[in-house]
Amino acid sequence: MPKEKKIIDKTHLAFAVLLLTWVLTDTQRFGNIPLLTMFLIFLIYPKIRLGKFGKMELGLFLYSVYISIVTLLNIKTQLSGYEANSFLLLIEYFLCIFLAFILSSNVDILIFLKDIGFVGGMLSVFGIVEGVLRFPIYHYLLSGKLNIPDIGTNDYRIVIIFAYPIICGGFLIMFLICKLFFPIKNNLLNILLLVSIIEAILMNKSRSSWLAIAFLLILYLIKYTKFNLKINKKVVIYTIFIFFVLFFLKIIFNVDVVSNIASEIIDRFSGSLNAGEGQIIRIETVQNSFIYWKDNIRILLFGGGKNYDKVFLQMYPVIKGGGSFVWNGAIDNEYITIIHESGLVGLAFILFVFFTAIKRFITCDKCDKSSVCVNMAVIGWATVIYFYEGFNYPFIFLTIAILCSLSDRCVEKEQQKNEIN
């Protein structure tokens, strides 16, 4: 077997292992055990090539080391019943970073990202079916649970295989980015998959994802817009095709797609003003956090250890309706949670990682699609986890770690290329 084909085949297998991890996580029957399926990559790549961490990998590693130390020092302040979960998550952080390093050091990055985009498009097709039926088909088949809100109603939000709607939204953003930068050769299928991802994002109804798209679009325009009159033929053809489809839907089925989309977006954002809606809860938990930190400077600076946010929420729950609604389950903001757990010191490590992604996106060569793609994907995740605790889900931390590792490998390849030249 030619060496190049062998690398490509192994890359497909490596992505299949990652996909299996995502699928098994949604079963919700094995706790966090699905992460162990990632060790299958050692069957694909039995020879481990050790090397130095890149900047983003090092940032994640130092964050994991620091929060582990803080957790050990504050073990007595842990909320009863969360001790085991805290240490399990910390162990999984290190496993994710190690596995991401091994995977990124062996796969063909371009093929791996193309696999993400293609499979993401196929999953989005499944998501559209789910959205039409307003029933979590795949989630129910995998987990046997019907714990998704608003089943059978107009407010239903698709989850596909990702456990919760807001988590699904983050993955859909990553799929969209990979699909845009790494299309398949079949143009018609490529357009259908791209449209499917966009429709799935709309059916997912996650405001965090929509905001992430807006932010990424601004960054993209800053990097790529030259403000000239050069016309790209493909863009013109795709634009005409989209307008034709919209016109056809309006005339034949009397479906005004643009108006429907605008109405859906307005409804989702206006709904956040209702008491008890996620955004109102987030605002109050943030306000309460600042009140708490004023009297607890040590926690603000250094944190109280993994899951310390649960301790805080027991003291400062969000109460609505004179006590009829009490929320103390989660802060629903990863950055505020990081401060509670590891202080401004821990937050500095994570911000270093995400700002490195932004810097690389802005400074990398426009023709280096792999680097642009992975850094955009990291920025997308950095945006959506502002609205929930993504680091409490090992398969999300793993996915972010893989993207960070791929970004580091892209930098290394560029440096090697420059040394040769």
Model-inferred region functions:
Residues L141-S143, L273-S342:
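Long extracytoplasmic/lumenal interhelical loops at the membrane interface
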Residues L113-L141, I160-K223:
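Alpha-helical transmembrane segments of multi-pass inner-membrane proteins
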Residues R134, Y224-L273, K294-N296:
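A membrane-periplasm/extracellular boundary helix in multi-pass inner-membrane enzymes
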Residues W22-L35, E83-N85, A163-G169, I191-K226, ...:
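Helix-loop-helix junctions and helix-breaking kinks within/between transmembrane helices
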Residues G59-S68, L79-S104, K114-D115, G120:
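Aromatic-anchored transmembrane helix interface
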Residues M1-S80, L110, K114, F182-L188, ...:
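Transmembrane signal-anchor hairpin modules in multi-pass inner-membrane enzymes, especially those
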Residues G54, L58, I184, L189, ...:
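Hydrophobic transmembrane alpha-helices and their immediate junctions
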Residues M38-F42, L217-I218, V353, V372-N421:
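Transmembrane alpha-helices of multi-pass inner-membrane enzymes
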